Design a protein with these regions (language model features):
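Symmetry-related core transmembrane helices of the 12-TM Major Facilitator Superfamily/SLC fold
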Residues: 212-224
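Intracellular juxtamembrane helix-capping segments at the cytosolic ends
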Residues: 150-164, 172
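Cytosolic juxtamembrane N-terminal segment immediately preceding the first transmembrane helix
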Residues: 1-55
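Hydrophobic core of transmembrane alpha-helices in multi-pass small-molecule transporters
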Residues: 120, 134-152
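Extracytoplasmic
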Residues: 41-72, 186-190
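Glycine-rich segments within core transmembrane alpha-helices of 12-TM secondary carriers
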Residues: 149, 169-198
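C-terminal ends and interior cores of transmembrane alpha-helices
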Residues: 115-132
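Central cavity-lining transmembrane alpha-helices of secondary-active solute carriers
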Residues: 81-101
Length: 224
């Protein structure tokens, strides 16, 4: 009981670290005074990060079928393997990412896992502009981007910690529901980005069956 009421000993302007040290969202007084504000901030941040993660995770599906049109002589088996890798890596990674917020903290896990996605996105953007890029390089980059799918479990575990049981279902629903809109977002924007001449920013396009294609745009756009 003493630990549960520790928040009442906090000073007039406690730091975030001090509040988290005595986190008890089931206490109505704590929740109204400290918990609700911090939990809501985390929900906003986590949801937006999850949108970006789902964008990155699904992004390759909009590109894989275009490889043959931009000079890559991969077999159908190789292309389908590349298309499957993000799902395989993401699903496997969720087994481990569930524990990440507890190991390094929710804020750290959200920032690190989202920031890491910049590496494969930049890498794929460069690789797609060079038809001599090896298949093995694509396997590495596409597998790396698959960790975006694992971010889902870390995000849900993080949000679940901050909310009381009475609000947890709503918070997790917002996080997962809006986060999954990233899938729709990439399918909506990819066709636009593929045909949008942004060569001054992202490099030249290549001739495709329906005009110039700027496949790298799909990767680079989401890094900014």
């Amino acid at each position: 009981m003493a630990d549960e009421m520790a928040w009442k000993n906090l000073g007039p302007n406690p730091s975030r670290k001090e509040i988290l040290a005595c986190w008890n969202p089931e206490d109505a007084g704590f929740w109204e005074k400290y918990g609700k504000r911090i939990a809501t901030q985390n929900l906003y941040t986590s949801t937006w990060a999850l949108v970006l993660s789902f964008v990155a995770w699904t992004l390759w599906a909009t590109i894989a079928a275009k490889l043959k049109f931009i000079g890559f002589n991969f077999s159908d088996d190789q292309i389908f393997t590349l298309a499957a890798l993000p799902g395989l890596v993401g699903a496997t990674g969720r087994l481990f990412y569930t524990y990440l917020p507890g190991l390094i903290g929710g804020r750290n896990s959200t920032f690190i896992t989202t920031a890491l996605l910049l590496l494969p996105l930049f890498g794929l953007g460069r690789a797609l502009q060079d038809p001599t890029t090896s298949y093995e390089t694509f396997v590495l980059l596409v597998s790396f981007i698959g960790i975006a799918g694992a971010n889902f479990s870390a995000s849900m575990a993080n949000i679940g910690f901050f909310f009381p049981k009475a609000n947890k279902g709503f918070a997790l629903g917002i996080n997962a529901g809006i986060g999954n809109l990233g899938v729709s977002l990439i399918y909506l924007t990819a066709p636009i980005l593929l045909g949008w001449n942004l060569s001054s920013l992202f490099g030249e396009g290549v001739p495709g069956p329906d005009g110039m294609m700027y496949v790298q745009n799909v990767c680079y756009f989401w890094t900014i």
